Amino acid sequence: APADFPTFVREGYDVRVITPPGYVTQDDGLVYKDFKVGEGKLPEDGQEVTFNYVAYNENGGTIDSTYRKGVPASTRLGINGMIPGFEEALKGMRAGGTRRVVVPPELGPPVGPATFFSSKQWEVFDIELIKVKSCERQQTGFMTSTVVCTD
């Protein structure tokens, strides 16, 4: 596991998370540690964020990474396109910042046969917020429009 990685202790069906010093636990259960605080304003719904991430399992093994793919991810906030806890973590970051976030099952992905996830579990991500763009809808024709995002 990476340095400063949380420990997950299973107690029956419950999981207790033990974090090294420097982590913050929010009221809704989201846990994070900022390794670097970025600059600028916090991103808001409707804005486009570009970021890199590493997703880990509870043992600290990498399960997905934009670094491995060589291309950062981009999405607009507030369109239900991400795991709720991941989006919440992004909204608390500034461009240039890096953060490790521990997402509780309640803020994690939906589970069930139609999803990739068969059971509720804790998710751990390292996130690097690269940039935030403002977006606006522009008319492209009589009945059509598109969303344009600019720095």
Protein language model features and the residues they cover:
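Cross-family detector of peptidyl-prolyl cis-trans isomerase
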Residues: 1-151
